[in-house]
């Protein structure tokens, strides 16, 4: 089985400088939603037809996906013509890249139907109360036709069974049929739909859930489809033992995994391939991207991206964990703390107003409020190492590269530029001077 995904269109009604299929739903570009369904249906040979700003679309595709370019957008039939030389299988499934909600189960069912009765083509159809914008399925005298809306009469426009844009073809039939279609229509395009009328054995299979085949033509429809996807994902998670306090304000990508008894508070975004364990508290007002979070972690009003958080850690409120951050068990990262490309050891804490970049911090370390790792010299980044059981006082600057030895104490307000040996006290600040009574008789204006 080969899948051809049509993704060459401009998408004029999106009024956008980027291709339509690149626009995201719940953090995942539409083209990747379709790819995800195709792969889960067990289809390995995948061809994506690109066109308008092809390089942007192609940059989103995995290496195992083939691409062909439709330099001139001359219709869906022409797009498949461009791709047909890369078809190596007896069956071809054709999908559009702007109908992101198609399920793997529906795709599997479609190719099973084609095989059972050796159809030349099976078309996925559904019924819409408002079919505006879709081609109509016309059944006459045992034959099947698809009429594009732009070419439809008023009588045909009243038909509510619509073409989804998803087809399963016998490869030999498709190759022959593509040679016979023409562009004698209002749009002067080669319609893939015209191949259906050439089939001796064709059927339209009605998909029970019409939302699966909804297409995106403008940003209103993009928002509507995101709302449908959001509802499906959140309901699935809640039925599997996750509490989502307000599903309407919780946005979760389709590949996110969340464990039982985790609570997701309102205004939370969990995106990418994030994995969250059991008994966690996430949110409110939190965004997590492509991160791994173990059991019993709380993340409150914070941002987490490409981070690893081990069990029992506490993050927030108002923390930022940037890519490359690892928090080990029972760490505490508090308000207005930013961590980047650093590992924080077990039971260590940085609870206030701190920046930790390119740092390795051991176990049972206290980072005082206002501590900064000065990791950048204007050219290169340098590492800070703080060993186990150290105590960093408030308002310290650690100028990297620098190492604080095990069990050491850095006095508040210090600027540390040299390594500190284990079990030492380091002070790097000016001596306090008091001139008692200096201003006792100071007159106003002096």
Curated annotation (Swiss-Prot):
Cofactor note: Binds 1 Mg(2+) ion per subunit.
Molecular functions per Gene Ontology: glucosamine-1-phosphate N-acetyltransferase activity; magnesium ion binding; UDP-N-acetylglucosamine diphosphorylase activity
Binding site for Mg(2+): 98, 217
Pfam families referenced in this protein's UniProt entry, alphabetically: Hexapep (PF00132), NTP_transf_3 (PF12804)
Active site per the UniProt annotation: 352 (proton acceptor)
Region (Pyrophosphorylase): 1-219
EC number: 2.7.7.23, 2.3.1.157
UniProt subcellular location: Cytoplasm
UniProt GO BP: cell morphogenesis; cell wall organization; lipid A biosynthetic process; peptidoglycan biosynthetic process; regulation of cell shape; UDP-N-acetylglucosamine biosynthetic process
Residues that, per the record, bind UDP-N-acetyl-alpha-D-glucosamine: 6-9, 20, 70, 75-76, 135, 148, 163, 217, 322, 340, 355, 366
Positions contributing to acetyl-CoA binding: 369, 375-376, 394, 412, 429
Catalysed reaction, written as an equation: alpha-D-glucosamine 1-phosphate + acetyl-CoA = N-acetyl-alpha-D-glucosamine 1-phosphate + CoA + H(+); N-acetyl-alpha-D-glucosamine 1-phosphate + UTP + H(+) = UDP-N-acetyl-alpha-D-glucosamine + diphosphate
Region (N-acetyltransferase): 241-446
Obligatory cofactor(s): Mg(2+)
Transmembrane segments: none
Chain residue ranges for the region called Linker: 220-240
Broad class of enzyme this protein falls into: transferase
One cellular-component annotation, GO: membrane
InterPro entries assigned: Bifunctional_GlmU (IPR005882), GlmU-like (IPR050065), GlmU_C_LbH (IPR038009), Hexapep (IPR001451), MobA-like_NTP_Trfase (IPR025877), Nucleotide-diphossugar_trans (IPR029044), Trimer_LpxA-like_sf (IPR011004)
Pathway: Nucleotide-sugar biosynthesis; UDP-N-acetyl-alpha-D-glucosamine biosynthesis; N-acetyl-alpha-D-glucosamine 1-phosphate from alpha-D-glucosamine 6-phosphate (route II): step 2/2; Nucleotide-sugar biosynthesis; UDP-N-acetyl-alpha-D-glucosamine biosynthesis; UDP-N-acetyl-alpha-D-glucosamine from N-acetyl-alpha-D-glucosamine 1-phosphate: step 1/1; Bacterial outer membrane biogenesis; LPS lipid A biosynthesis
Keywords: Acyltransferase, Cell shape, Cell wall biogenesis/degradation, Cytoplasm, Magnesium, Metal-binding, Multifunctional enzyme, Nucleotidyltransferase, Peptidoglycan synthesis, Repeat, Transferase
Family: In the N-terminal section; belongs to the N-acetylglucosamine-1-phosphate uridyltransferase family.
Subunit details: Homotrimer.
NCBIfam families: glmU (TIGR01173), PRK14354.1 (NF010934)
Function recorded in the entry: Catalyzes the last two sequential reactions in the de novo biosynthetic pathway for UDP-N-acetylglucosamine (UDP-GlcNAc). The C-terminal domain catalyzes the transfer of acetyl group from acetyl coenzyme A to glucosamine-1-phosphate (GlcN-1-P) to produce N-acetylglucosamine-1-phosphate (GlcNAc-1-P), which is converted into UDP-GlcNAc by the transfer of uridine 5-monophosphate (from uridine 5-triphosphate), a reaction catalyzed by the N-terminal domain.
Name the record gives this protein: Bifunctional protein GlmU
Organism this protein belongs to: Kosmotoga olearia (strain ATCC BAA-1733 / DSM 21960 / TBF 19.5.1)
Taxonomic classification: Bacteria, Thermotogati, Thermotogota, Thermotogae, Kosmotogales
Gene name tied to this protein: glmU
């Amino acid at each position: 089985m080969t899948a051809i995904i049509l993704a060459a269109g401009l998408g004029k009604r999106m009024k956008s400088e980027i291709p339509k299929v690149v626009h995201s739903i719940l953090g995942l570009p539409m083209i990747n939603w379709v790819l995800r369904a195709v792969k889960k249906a067990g289809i390995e040979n995948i061809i994506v037809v690109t066109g308008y700003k092809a390089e942007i679309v192609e940059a989103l595709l995995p290496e195992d996906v083939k691409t062909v370019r439709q330099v001139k957008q001359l219709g869906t039939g022409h797009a498949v013509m461009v791709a047909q030389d890369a078809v190596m299988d007896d069956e071809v499934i054709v999908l559009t890249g702007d109908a992101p909600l198609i399920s793997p189960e529906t795709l599997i069912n479609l190719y099973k139907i084609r095989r059972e009765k050796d159809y030349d083509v099976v078309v996925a159809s559904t019924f819409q109360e408002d079919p505006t914008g879709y081609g109509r399925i016309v059944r006459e005298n045992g034959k099947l036709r698809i009429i594009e809306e732009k070419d439809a009469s008023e009588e045909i426009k009243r038909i509510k069974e619509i073409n989804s844009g998803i087809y399963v073809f016998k490869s030999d039939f498709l190759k022959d049929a593509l040679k016979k279609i023409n562009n004698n229509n209002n749009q002067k395009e080669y319609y893939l739909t015209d191949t259906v009328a050439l089939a001796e054995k064709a059927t339209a299979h009605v998909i029970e859930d019409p939302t699966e085949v909804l297409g995106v033509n403008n940003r209103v429809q993009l928002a509507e489809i995101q709302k449908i996807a959001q509802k499906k994902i959140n309901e699935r998670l809640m039925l599997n033992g996750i509490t989502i306090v307000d599903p309407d304000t919780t946005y979760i990508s389709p590949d996110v995994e969340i464990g039982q008894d985790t609570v997701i508070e309102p205004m939370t975004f969990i995106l990418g391939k994030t994995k969250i364990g059991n008994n966690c508290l996430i949110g409110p007002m939190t965004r997590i991207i492509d991160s791994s979070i173990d059991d019993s972690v709380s993340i409150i009003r914070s941002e987490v991206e490409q981070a690893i958080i081990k069990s029992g850690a506490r993050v927030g409120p108002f923390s930022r964990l940037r890519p490359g951050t690892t928090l080990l068990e029972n760490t505490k990262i508090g308000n207005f703390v930013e961590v980047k490309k650093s590992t924080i050891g077990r039971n260590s804490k940085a609870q206030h107003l701190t920046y930790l970049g390119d740092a390795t911090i051991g176990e049972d370390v206290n980072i005082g409020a206002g501590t900064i790792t000065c990791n950048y010299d204007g050219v290169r980044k340098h590492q800070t190492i703080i060993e186990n059981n150290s105590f960093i006082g408030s308002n310290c600057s650690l100028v990297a590269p620098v190492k604080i030895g095990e069990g050491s104490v850095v006095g508040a307000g210090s600027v540390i530029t040299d390594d500190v040996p284990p079990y030492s006290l380091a002070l790097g600040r000016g001596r306090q001077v008091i001139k008692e009574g200096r201003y006792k008789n100071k007159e106003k204006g002096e």
